[in-house]
């Protein structure tokens, strides 16, 4: 899922890379099948047997309805997915504009997915303390950056995979929280 007319180019399209590339992908984001835990592997035939032996017990036997949904997603027109990507882009633009107006916060526009990595270092709070404040006092949830590695301390990850109404409420609450710091 990418925005702003950016183009994705797989490494497999580079000369001599196709046979050396392993693509692992799923249906969660683009086909709105989050939590269904189904995906696929694209690789050179010589790599398939070792990969299947390695992963068989952790990825085998998805539910029948999930398998059928994945097949349908691949066969059907992706108009609904394209419309959802456009909606996510609209939400991303709104969130970035609003988040960049918050006291002590800054973010760049992500080129894909539905998460924003918000820089909160100017607030003086750790990412954990920031998340606890937002959740416990203002009922807005997000993920502290430190869970993504030590270099991500001072950031929080915010999802905009929600309704515009809820995102507007979250922005109002975050603004109120930061005005009291």
List PLM regions with ranges:
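PLP-dependent class I/II
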Residues: 1-181
């Amino acid at each position: 899922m990418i925005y702003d007319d950016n183009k994705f180019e797989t490494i497999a399209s580079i000369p001599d890379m196709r046979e050396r590339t392993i693509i692992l992908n799923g249906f969660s984001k683009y086909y709105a099948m989050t939590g269904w835990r189904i995906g696929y592997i694209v690789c050179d035939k010589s790599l398939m047997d070792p990969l299947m032996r390695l992963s068989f017990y952790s990825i085998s036997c998805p539910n029948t309805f999930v398998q059928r949904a994945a097949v349908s997603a691949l066969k059907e027109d992706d108009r609904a997915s394209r419309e959802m990507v456009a909606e996510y882009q609209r939400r991303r633009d709104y969130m970035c504009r609003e988040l960049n107006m918050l006291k002590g916060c800054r973010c760049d526009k992500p080129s894909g997915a539905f998460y924003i990595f918000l820089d909160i270092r100017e607030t003086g709070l750790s990412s954990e303390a920031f998340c606890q404040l937002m959740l416990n006092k203002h009922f807005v949830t997000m993920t502290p950056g430190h869970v993504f590695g030590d270099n991500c301390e001072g950031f929080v990850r915010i999802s905009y995979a929600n309704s515009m109404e809820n995102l507007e409420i979250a922005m109002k609450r975050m603004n109120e929280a930061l005005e009291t710091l």
